[in-house]
A protein has these predicted regions:
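Short hydrophobic alpha-helical segments that form membrane-spanning helices or hydrophobic packing faces
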Residues: 12, 95, 212, 397-401
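Arginine/glycine-rich "motif VI" loop of SF2 helicases in the C-terminal RecA-like domain
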Residues: 6-11
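A structure-centric signal for secondary-structure junctions around beta-strands
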Residues: 12-13, 426
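C-terminal structured domains
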Residues: 358-361, 365, 369-430
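Second RecA-like catalytic domain
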Residues: 4, 16-339, 343-359
């Protein structure tokens, strides 16, 4: 701590640092500051108490905007902030408890075991090694199955803190370990991914892993109460079992069915699903057999943007002709067509929901529908699909090269007084 002295002076009551460590921090050799790496829930709640925004304050090291938003989202899940980010009465009550907001919420809403669990989660792990199972820590505090390698000093502090926290706690809320853990960490309810390895996705959207040898490795649902901080896929250091029924009962207001139509790049088709979700967790997933055609068409547009236009022969000829037209004519460049798909394509996509469907799709009617009658007449005059010889024979014009061309015998143009032109360019005769 530092005490104020005369203007420009600061008297330290603690350790005095030389400049070398600060040079080390600037060089990146020291651990990041707490505001860079720590949990920002308490900080975000304090901001809300004062009705302040982080941008209003000056920091030596400002908080990361994304991590601050995550903390505010957690506080909203805890009921400490409302939907506008303002502090609630429950949030104000949490600030009066000598605990992290997560744990304060658990003690306020949980049963008789909540103070003990809060004390365990506030202290360094009393068990050295072994399973991550939080139930083993509760047993050790209660004097049941205490392993030889227990940290007795930490255990003693946990017991003292638990007694202190229990004073004034009503304890009339849920008391199941998994539910208590989920009350504190609603963003860390973890659902096991498919596959043999114990890899999990958490309700907040991040990934987590568990040692394959841990007794909890086969559990479908866990609550991760301590993680190693890896930003890509954190390793669980403490966790509690959570039953499906307890999750549904305790968080019924946050679990709901969602309908979605999305383009699957991996499968090359539109997926229409009904999913029961808790945060990022998909608890149940079913086919949406009666998905509206409009929803499927909108999802297919993402597939079209990935695959490209894929025009057939007739559509490719039309596009080549249209792209020869000058200013004032509708834009038929591929970039423009893909950017404006919503304006011209959805109504033509009935029955199209996969890569194979799109390859077989006749694009020409959708393209020509973009033209007015006058535009169509102008196109036929300036860049016709066929050239009519003096003998009355119609010959298809090839627009695939840089210059339009036709293949015919020279005798067939006898009687023509001037060279045929296409959109201002000479028609090449081969």
């Amino acid at each position: 701590d530092a005490a104020r002295g005369p203007c420009g002076a600061c008297v330290g009551r603690g350790r005095v640092q030389t400049m070398d460590p600060w040079r080390g921090r600037r060089a990146g050799r020291l651990p990041p500051a707490e505001i860079e790496a720590g949990d920002l829930c308490a900080f975000a709640l304090e901001l809300a108490v004062w009705g302040a925004q982080a941008d209003d304050l000056k920091f030596v090291t400002p908080p990361h905007a994304g991590r601050l938003a995550e903390a505010q989202a957690v506080l909203h899940m805890l009921g400490a902030l409302d939907s506008t980010g303002r502090i609630t009465e429950h949030g104000r009550s949490l600030t009066k408890m000598p605990l992290h907001p997560r744990l304060a919420h658990m003690v306020a809403k949980g049963g008789r075991s909540a103070p003990t669990l809060a004390a365990i989660l506030s202290e360094r792990d009393p068990l050295r090694g072994g399973s991550v199972d939080l139930a083993l820590r509760l047993d050790a505090v209660a004097g049941k199955r205490v392993p030889a390698e227990v940290n007795h000093a930490a255990l003693s502090r946990i017991k003292q803190d638990a007694k202190r926290l229990a004073r004034g706690q009503t304890g009339d809320g849920p008391d199941t370990l998994g539910v208590l853990a989920a009350l504190a960490y609603p963003d860390r309810v973890a659902l096991r991914r498919k596959g043999d390895a114990p890899r999990y996705v958490m309700s907040g959207g991040k990934g987590a892993i568990l040692s394959e040898s841990d007794p909890l490795a086969g559990e479908r649902l866990l609550v991760a109460t301590d993680l190693d901080g890896d930003p890509r896929e954190a390793r669980m250091r403490q966790a509690a079992r959570l039953s499906d029924s307890d999750l549904r009962e305790s968080f019924a207001d946050q679990i709901g069915w969602h309908k979605l139509c999305v383009w699957s790049r991996r499968e090359g088709r539109v997926l229409a699903r009904q999913q029961e979700r808790f945060g990022a967790l998909v608890l149940d997933d079913r086919a949406w057999s009666d998905a509206p055609a409009e929803d499927i068409a909108q999802a297919m547009l993402d597939g079209v943007r990935q695959l490209g236009l894929m025009p057939g022969k007739a559509a490719a000829l039309f596009l080549a002709r249209a792209r020869l037209m000058g200013d004032g004519f509708p834009d038929f460049s591929e970039d423009h067509l893909l950017e404006t798909l919503e304006d011209w394509l959805p109504g033509h996509l009935a029955g199209v929901r996969s890569t194979a469907d799109w390859k077989a799709f006749d694009l020409l009617p959708a393209l020509t529908a973009r033209l007015s009658w006058d535009d169509q007449q102008a196109l036929d005059r300036a860049a016709p699909a066929h050239f009519t010889t003096p003998l009355g024979r119609k010959i298809a014009i090839d627009y695939s090269e840089t210059q339009p061309q036709i293949a015919l015998r020279l005798q067939e143009v006898f009687g023509t007084t001037r060279h045929p032109m296409i959109a201002g360019q000479p028609l090449q005769i081969t």
